[in-house]
């Protein structure tokens, strides 16, 4: 009766109080954007009077960037796997504008450079990976492409593999279609 309902309310508030700080940390300290738009075709971004022109001319838009995102699978040397989203930007400086790359313990900054391959902490832990380890990304053609991990970043809500433009082009075999 009343005791059961009261218990459910307390549990609900407890869950809310334990989740909200994580959401706040992710959205205020680690990810810095107000909106993400998924594109079905890069032409929506680049055509005349397309999204890029609209964003450039809007006084409400402080900054924007073209990104590539795609779900894929990572594999470690032992055959363990994890599903992740690859994230790369048309301009590498956008990566550090929209994402903070740092360690969870100590908040040491992780540089984002031309050869960066940064994995979220929980995924690296689940695959038993450390900085300098080689792992494999399943490419669009089904082949597994080796990458060397350059950083393990604090993260709470997503499983992501952040790649520099050079690493992304190497993985894809050319310039990606910017879809986000």
Where are each of the predicted segments found?
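Short beta-strand boundary microenvironments
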Residues: 25-26, 49-63, 67-134, 146-148
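A short beta-strand structural signal in non-transmembrane regions
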Residues: 34-41, 123-124, 150-152, 175-180
């Amino acid at each position: 009766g009343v005791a059961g309902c009261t218990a459910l309310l307390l549990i609900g508030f407890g869950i809310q109080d334990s989740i909200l700080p994580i959401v706040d940390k992710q959205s205020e300290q680690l990810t810095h954007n107000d909106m993400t738009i998924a594109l079905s075709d890069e032409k929506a971004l680049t055509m005349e009077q397309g999204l890029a022109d609209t964003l450039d001319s809007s006084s409400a838009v402080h900054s924007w960037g073209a990104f590539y995102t795609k779900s894929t699978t990572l594999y470690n040397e032992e055959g363990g796997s994890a599903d992740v989203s690859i994230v790369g930007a048309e301009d590498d400086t956008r990566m550090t504008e929209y994402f903070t790359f740092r360690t969870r313990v100590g908040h040491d900054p992780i540089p984002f450079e031309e050869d960066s391959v940064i994995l979220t902490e929980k995924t690296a832990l689940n695959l038993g990976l450390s900085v300098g380890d080689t792992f494999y990304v399943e490419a669009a053609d089904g082949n597994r492409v080796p990458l060397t991990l350059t950083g393990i970043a604090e993260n709470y809500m997503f499983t992501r593999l952040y790649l520099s433009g050079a690493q992304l082009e190497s993985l894809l075999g050319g310039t990606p279609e910017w879809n986000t």
